Amino acid sequence: MARRYLMTYGDELTGAILCGTGEQASATLFAGKTVAGILGAFKGQRYRSEFIRKTSFKGYNDRFEKRTENDWLTKDQSIVDWYNGHKFCTFGFTINGYKTLFEVLTYIQKQENYNKIPKNLPVYMIAGEDDPVGNYGEGVKHIYQQYKDSGIKDISIKLYPNDRHEILNELDKETVYADVADWIAGHM
């Protein structure tokens, strides 16, 4: 959502920090939109599909010990346990919510939309190297290169070794917060 915001309102910003961003294969997004459209037609837009919830996050936990279904979020087990026990964290989106998510992801991954981001907007990309959302750092590096190729002048990237998706809740979060504070101090 932050990347979509940059494409629409980037000229109103002083800088942007993208945390835990990623990308999905176009075919995956097309399939997701199609399935959500079909389910929405039969079940309604407010229906919550366990199938779409599970397939949307399928594989995210594959590289980690299977203690819970959300261990991909962070190495900090107390955070994962808190997340799993909180009703506002573990709900699935409605069909409309997933369809909108797939549409936004499709939009932000088009090269012509990268070009809508102001070239003078400072952007700092941070992510965990073990984050499946960012394809274990490779997706984040690809987005970084796309931003550079689109002409963004002040862009930097930092990948945190052994960190997963929620780097602001990781065991080394103090380092992450210090890096963010340093970037802000140098750009604002």
Label the model's feature ranges.
Residues 132-142:
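Conserved alpha/beta-hydrolase "acid-adjacent" motif
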Residues 117-123, 150-153:
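Short, proline-enriched alpha-helix->beta-strand connector loops that line the catalytic pocket
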Residues 125-127:
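Short beta-strand/loop motif that positions the catalytic acidic residue
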Residues 19-20, 108-109, 179-183:
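Non-catalytic cap/lid and distal C-terminal segments of serine-dependent acyl enzymes
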Residues 129-132, 163-164:
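Acidic beta-to-alpha connecting loop that harbors the catalytic carboxylate
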Residues 148-188:
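Catalytic active-site module of serine/aspartate enzymes centered on a nucleophile-bearing elbow/loop
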Residues 2-88:
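Alpha/beta-hydrolase-fold enzymes
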Residues 93-115:
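Active-site nucleophile elbow and catalytic-triad environment of alpha/beta-hydrolase enzymes
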